[in-house]
Amino acid sequence: MHPEASEPVVDGVAEQECAQEPGVEESAGDHGNAGEGGRKEEMNDPKETCVGPLNTSCLSEQKQSGDSWSDGRLAHQRADKEDRGARMTKKFLQKLCKQHKLYITPALNDTLYLHYKGFDRIENLEEYTGLRCLWLECNGIQKIENLEAQTELRCLFLQVNLLHKIENLEPLQKLDALNISNNYIKTIENLSCLPVLNTLQMAHNHLETVEDIQHLRECARLCVLDLSHNKLSDPEILRVLESMPDLRVLNLMGNPVIKNIPNYRRILTVRLKHLTYLDDRPVFPKDRACAEAWARGGYAAEKEERQQREMRERKKITDSIEALAALRRQAEERKWQRASQEQGEEPTPAGAGDVDAEVEGEEEPQEKDTRQKIEQFVKESFEAKDELFPEKPEEPSLLEELPLDVGEPKGVLPSEVLPASPRAAWAELAPQTVATESASGTEPDGAENLEATRLETKEQLFIDDLPNLEDVNAGESLGDRDREQCFPKITAISSLSDASEPDMDDISLLALENTSSDTLSSIFAVPKDTSWRVETETPFTDILKVAPERDPETQRKASEVPRPLIQELGDDEEPSGPPPLPPVCEGEAVPAPCTEDSDGDLLPAPAPGNGPEKDEVQSEVEPEERLGSEAGENREDIEFGLD
């Protein structure tokens, strides 16, 4: 009757069927249950209605929605797996080996680092048969398992896990160190199957009674035991520890039993015979001896034992020092013997053997043995030194090659032996010649005396013999100076000087009074003339030629008329007379100052009395003598300052 109304009914049924399929939105079902207005809107909207031709598209949409739902469920499951922890898979282990630069082939690796990875169980290690060290620290492992293939394992680290029991360690016959600290273990068990177990660390667990550690009696090879920070409180645990024959290191810190045992350290040291390290410090032999003395006789015996050991230690130090002293003494003796052999002498130290015999007679047998050991040690030390460092003959040095002079003063350096210049050598030679002549007391006369003088004048020349350029004290009288310094030299030189020397002395006095830089430089300058250089290099022959060239009459006059120095300076005689002797020490006077020509060469001055310059020099000396007479004793004489 009403076909138009029937069509929407069919459409509405189709919509309900679509709404019942999974993956379709719930809003579509809600719209199906809505009023007629809502249904009319759905019929008028071609996008949301499912008409006959569009049934295939509706089914495809349902299928796509189902696939997306299944993918989301799988992803959720994978996330749950990741939350539960990582698995020790073969792929993961291979990747880890590559990351740590280990071998890709599992059997070639001897160490595997699996700590801090969050594993909850041990698995997939069958291929790693060559492991010697396995790190499983800081994981969530709840059980020791799946270690049957690790027969070569030496070290197993399982600290900071969730273990409650020690088990499944039978395949590890070569295990040496086991660390299961920071777990929840309440009893030590299943360790007797490890025949070579040396180190067991069980700190921070839940051990409480003697029965919990009773299994340690069966661990005969256990050497290091760490039971710190447990709940052990019974002193009877010492019986268990005493039964462990190889126990060397024990740590019981953090247990109540420490407070329950009086004299805890002494008692454990005495009862555990092989203990070398207790808790946080070693057990020294001295501590063990004192503890055993305390066990025998109390605190007094311990004090006595401690004093005896201190005395022995002190004696040991003293013996060491004596051995070193013996080494040094024997080294000095060998050096002294070597020096004696070089000099051709073979003396023996007086009384050395007697002293040694007396000492050996007074010593006790024990001290004698100690002394013999020291001597043996010294002997072996020197033999080793001779083997390693053979002694070589010392080459004579430059100072030893130089001739030793009788008159050479001590402390003179080699640089001071040579004179500064040829003039200095000339000036230094005169006093030595005078000294030799005055010591002999006779004047050289003839060839024999000349040869004797040559032999006596072989002395070294020093810069120290030059006069010191210092000011002379003005308050000192000239007479005292003459008597103290120059009078003996004037009498000795008077026999060697001729009549022309007083004029020469006047010139030198004038030159020394007018001391200037030019004069001093001319004195110490080396002339360029080769003939003068040859003469200065051989001063001995020139000086010794002075005596035979003089006339006997001039020698007699010079020796008969010596005048005192004060009388000469005070005289106002005429310049025409013979000039007086100056206060110059003739032995130390240098040759007459040289004149400098236009080319700058130094030429020797002509002899006084042989040229026209004699009158000019005498006229210049006369006013100087007058000034000296007016000044009196307060005048400062530079000549004596140079002496």
UniProtKB/Swiss-Prot annotation:
What broad class describes the main subcellular location of this protein?
Answer: other
Tell me the ranges covered by the LRRCT domain, including all copies: 256-294
Location in the cell reads: Cell projection, Cilium
In this chain, composition skew of type Polar residues spans 54-68
Q: Which InterPro entries match?
A: Cilia_flagella_integrity (IPR050576), Leu-rich_rpt (IPR001611), LRR_dom_sf (IPR032675)
Matches recorded under Gene3D superfamilies = Ribonuclease Inhibitor (3.80.10.10)
Q: Which GO terms describe its cellular component?
A: axoneme
Offer one Pfam family short name for this entry.
LRR_9
LRR repeat start and end residues: 107-129, 130-151, 152-173, 174-195, 196-217, 221-242
Ranges for the region named Disordered are: 1-85, 332-405, 537-643
Q: Which GO terms describe its biological process?
A: axoneme assembly; cilium assembly
Q: Which UniProt keywords apply?
A: Cell projection, Cilium, Leucine-rich repeat, Phosphoprotein, Repeat
Could you tell me where the Acidic residues compositional bias lies?
A: 355-366
Which GO molecular function entries does the Swiss-Prot or TrEMBL record give? dynein complex binding
Similarity annotation: Belongs to the DNAAF1 family.
The role this protein plays is: Cilium-specific protein required for the stability of the ciliary architecture. Plays a role in cytoplasmic preassembly of dynein arms. Involved in regulation of microtubule-based cilia and actin-based brush border microvilli.
The molecule here is called Dynein axonemal assembly factor 1
Top-level taxonomy: Eukaryota, Metazoa, Chordata, Craniata, Vertebrata
Originating gene: DNAAF1
